[in-house]
Amino acid sequence: MAKAGVMTLSHVDRMNLRTWTMAIACCLLSFVNIVVFSVAAHFPGIGFPCYYPRIIDFDNMNLTMYNAIHHLTPQLFLDPVQLIVYVIFTELIFFCVLSYYIVCWVQIYFRSEHGTQVNQSTRDINFMGDSATCFTFVLTMDTFQIFLLSLSFRLPSMVAFSKCMYFMCLTAFVVTLVTHYESRERSAFALSKIHPKLQGTIRYRTAVVNLTQLILGFATMVLAMSLALGFGNSFFVKTAHVVFGAMVAFAIVACVYFSIIESVLSRYMKVQFGYHIGTILGVCGAMYPIIRYEALNASSYARDINIGITVLLLLCVAFSVIRTVRFLLRRNKRYRALALDNEEIRALRSDAE
């Protein structure tokens, strides 16, 4: 029998908790699958046609060369060491997200007191990351696995397509994890109604959001490189022009995401620096092949490429400074003036008169 003032699990809570448990189990299976897949891809004779990190031979790269039909034309991409580090780091972030979901599930599933409000568990699940968000995370991991498989088969068009799908799924996961499909006011109201024992877990949620934004920022540069790889091997274009096109694509996508963070997402969560750090790391990752390989460094286009990379880096740093300044200003704001045209204020004034 329930204690006085304490609610038991309702039918809605039980159904949502079961669905959420199944979603987290699917996340766990997908994570194990992608880890086993990425490890097996490093060993020959298991079924992978090529060693996926070596999709580009920088020694044969020529910026003045046009696309060679029916041959893989080298384009600007991550070198083997960078690609392996990128895969490992991405999977570590996936592990952190999965750990966050498991911690939330343990705290909600095994707690003795379910709260004093109706459907308290449903409220908590929706705020911490509901079943739809979990399934979006599953799609994110699955599309990343398809991206690695495309690299192994050395299919440039498929690499570009799978990277676009992964980028869109990761974007959807980040946005839904921040907004909960709700307005800022409803999200703030849901935060005030969660179970008291989950207050400390909110800090982990902030860290998870920033970590996923970090890989989203780096994935922006990988997306631009993947599009360049697919476009440069599908049309009769010069390699140097494809490199410049990748820079423009990165600048456009990054500016759009920076604007969304500043105008929309920052209202839901104050601490959001992950995407800014990720884009800076992505630009630095693009610098490494240009500096390391003589075929790129000695080209007549090297100066223009270096200028373009520098502009991209300054762009990311500028938006990072803007985010930092806005965060500090919002943090130091002690109060907010009430709007003079508020209906409640007008009603109070009329009553006073």
Curated annotation (Swiss-Prot):
Membrane topology field: Multi-pass membrane protein
Pfam families linked to this entry: Herpes_glycop
Transmembrane segments: 28-48, 83-103, 133-153, 158-178, 211-231, 241-261, 271-291, 305-325
Intravirion face of the membrane: 1-27, 104-132, 179-210, 262-270, 326-353
Stretches of the chain found on the membrane's Virion surface side: 49-82, 154-157, 232-240, 292-304
Main location: virion
The entry's keywords: Disulfide bond, Glycoprotein, Host endosome, Host Golgi apparatus, Host membrane, Host nucleus, Membrane, Transmembrane, Transmembrane helix, Viral envelope protein, Virion
Keyword Oxidoreductase recorded: no
Record carries keyword Cell inner membrane: no
Signal peptide: none
InterPro entries linked: Herpes_glycop_M
GO cellular component annotations of the record: host cell endosome membrane; host cell Golgi apparatus; host cell nuclear inner membrane; membrane; viral envelope; virion membrane
Subcellular location: Virion membrane; Host Golgi apparatus, Host trans-Golgi network; Host endosome membrane; Host nucleus inner membrane
Function noted in UniProt: Envelope glycoprotein important for virion assembly and egress. Plays a role in the correct incorporation of gH-gL into virion membrane. Directs the glycoprotein N (gN) to the host trans-Golgi network.
Subunit details: Interacts (via N-terminus) with gN (via N-terminus). The gM-gN heterodimer forms the gCII complex.
Family the UniProt entry places it in: Belongs to the herpesviridae glycoprotein M family.
Protein name, per record: Envelope glycoprotein M
Organism per entry: Murid herpesvirus 1 (strain K181) (MuHV-1)
